Amino acid sequence: MAAKQVLFSDEARAKMLDGVNTLANAVKVTLGPKGRNVVLDKSFGAPTITKDGVSVAKEIELEDKFENMGAQIVKEVASKTADVAGDGTTTATVLAQALLTEGLKAVAAGINPMDLKRGIDKATARLVEELKALSKPCSDPKSIEQVGTISANSDATVGKLIADAMAKVGKEGVITVEEGKGFEDELDVVEGMQFDRGYLSPYFATNQENMTTDLENPYILIVDKKISNIRDLLPILEGVSKSGRALLIIAEDVESEALATLVVNNMRGVVKVCAVKAPGFGDRRKAMLEDIATLTGATFVSEDLSMKLEETNMEHLGTASRVQVTKDNTTIIDGAGEKEAIAKRINVIKANIAEANSDYDREKLQERLAKLSGGVAVIKVGAVTEAEMKEKKDRVDDALHATRAAVEEGIVAGGGVALIRAQKALDGLTGENDDQNHGIALLRKAIEAPLRQIVSNAGGESSVVVNQVKANQGNYGYNAANDTYGDMVEMGILDPTKVTRSALQHAASIAGLMITTEAMIGEIKEAAPAMPMGGGMGGMPGMI
């Protein structure tokens, strides 16, 4: 086991603060409408230019191990805020730095760190309640557009794209961000339910030019097994043939002999049919097949549910107004499932999302929810260069997360004003002793830091602006984009309540832990052994 170095008290806290300041100073230059970019060196490819706080924080590793500990702890604030709210990482970092700087000064002056932390925790709980009281619902397209615009660094086109996407697929719908192929931003909306499985044979294609299969008002059979014997399908095929309608088969697989029979019957015009593989794998496949069955009004044919393929008849088939199948995707439009059954299924998925432990599971459940409840919107980001593309895609991602957070918990006045207005909730709040009171006063001052940083990044005098904002009431604040004062909500400068709340809670939590740190332990790097000298080369005869 390698030897360890131990730092105590003021020496440990000073090192930790140096690391925090290095990281926070790099992150906070990105805050506000006049925040600057940060260039990140990459081990391969061109450098990345970004204005995304969490991207900057993730890149920082310091040489001094004790300073690096401080930086990594504050990096956790940014990452956690991004995970929970999707935005607000820079605000969280600025708050953590302000709290820690003032907190360590107080500890050095002899204030008890544990009571200081208790005071901060007490004040944080009161501020969170006040932020929720100040919050207003965000449901109309204009508010959604404004939140998206602010989070995308005042880019109105991005705000409008997100508002349009939400209007088309609903607030529960899946909206994804991809790199586009052109210079302009685009919005593509996939109506109905789409899954990434295409036809099992190109001979099912009805449109030879586009190689697509278009089925109007088809029957839909959903099976959770491989179809190997065509005899199992005969009752269904005969019934569909008599009806004169088409049939879409969704199964785990269709083996070669059965597939060949289906292709031949399709080409001869005996029955118009198309077979596709079921989407997903394992339990997720079964869940997705049940979703499709609910959407189309079909009975899910599964041996787990004591149903065999050979026992199925026309009553077990679902329908949809239209189905389009390509070599890669299948889209079911306007399924004939009962609205009550679909709503019930949606509620089950929502409950599963609430209980999901991993981000991956949550994302997949969210996709299933969207496919059942409306569709999928894809925002394709356009740019001239690859560097601009990456930077813009980060901003659009931030804006999308912010608008989702706004829809979930509502909005408050932006530009740091909500935190200033929440200060009044601390009036009359007292702790059990003077040291706790100092913690409350410390947080009251620290929550001015985001507004001060926005003003500093815009080249203004922060104390003058903060005093001007505090002298007024309501949504009155400072618009750093054009150096004016006014009603922040009317000017469209809004922050999601969830983002502001998460930033405050995570910053206060981490700062409290760091203030109460008394020792730091790090590994001592062993000096690399010197290289041995190489042996001399023997001379050759006859050489001088």
From Swiss-Prot:
It catalyses: ATP + H2O + a folded polypeptide = ADP + phosphate + an unfolded polypeptide. It is an enzyme of class 5 (isomerase). Disulfide bonds: none annotated. Keywords: ATP-binding, Chaperone, Cytoplasm, Isomerase, Nucleotide-binding. GO terms for molecular function: ATP binding; ATP-dependent protein folding chaperone; isomerase activity; unfolded protein binding. Its main location: cytoplasm. InterPro entries: Chaperonin_Cpn60_CS, Cpn60/GroEL, Cpn60/GroEL/TCP-1, GroEL-like_apical_dom_sf, GROEL-like_equatorial_sf, TCP-1-like_intermed_sf. It is found in: Cytoplasm. GO terms for biological process: protein refolding. Its EC number is 5.6.1.7. Pfam families: Cpn60_TCP1. Belongs to the chaperonin (HSP60) family. This is Chaperonin GroEL. It comes from Francisella tularensis subsp. mediasiatica (strain FSC147).
